[in-house]
Amino acid sequence: MTESENTELRIAVIGAGPAGVYSSDIFLRQLKKLGEELGLGTKARIDLFEKLPVPFGLVRYGVAPDHPSIKFIASALEKTLDNPDIHLYCDVEFGKDVTLDDLLARYDAVLFATGAVKDKPLNLPGADLDGVYGAAKFVEWYDGYPTGAREWPLTAENVAVIGGGNVAMDVARELMRNADDLKAKTDYPGQCLRGHRQQQGENPPPVHPPRCGPGQVQRAGAARDGE
């Protein structure tokens, strides 16, 4: 057995969301194939550090509650964590519990897979006014993020959503649904259901999607009014 075969690399991964977990799995697979050729050996220990009490990041706390099937991806991630060469440490926050110097002193490499943890600044006049929110904070609320808001103001009769991507569609869809519909078809957190029922009432406001023309908007409004 060569010296490289006896060497065990130590890798630290910051963030145990999909990117961190899959990167760990891919690294171990590639190391078995190419490690000896590259002089790295074929063995490694990967330590995953997650600041939340649970892993899987946006799969758990970023997918809209009315898409529970997408959250089944977590089962595949759990299988990856069954690998004895991957070790998960939750409730460990980079910059608070461990520093880069700490990690570099103990590991051969450090991978950051922290994702987008903050909203992108809007950089528009009035963006700092009351009633203007970033989607990330709203998503944290309706997904029950551990440190997210427990209450959210839902009394507005008219809401403008800036953007037309997947998150914008999720936000618009959540705003227009009533509490009974959410309870029946989603895994919405209990405090959010109560907030919808108490503040929004039974008739949520209509939403006009950005990916359609005036005719489609008119037909959507007519359909809601029963015309």
List where the protein language model places each region.
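A structural signal for isolated positions on well-ordered beta-strands in alpha/beta enzyme cores
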Residues: 12, 45-47, 87, 160, ...
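Conserved acidic residues
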Residues: 10, 108, 130, 157, ...
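Beta1/beta-strand and adjacent pyrophosphate-binding region of the FAD-binding site
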Residues: 5-17, 155-162
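Short hydrophobic core segments
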Residues: 108-115, 160-162
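Glycine-rich dinucleotide-binding loop and its adjacent helix/turn
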Residues: 119-198
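Hydrophobic/small residue at the entry helix of a nucleotide-binding pocket
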Residues: 18-19, 23, 167
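N-terminal Rossmann-like dinucleotide/flavin-binding domain of flavoprotein oxidoreductases
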Residues: 37-45, 52-109
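Dinucleotide-binding/catalytic capping subdomain of oxidoreductase cores
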Residues: 30-51, 59, 169-227
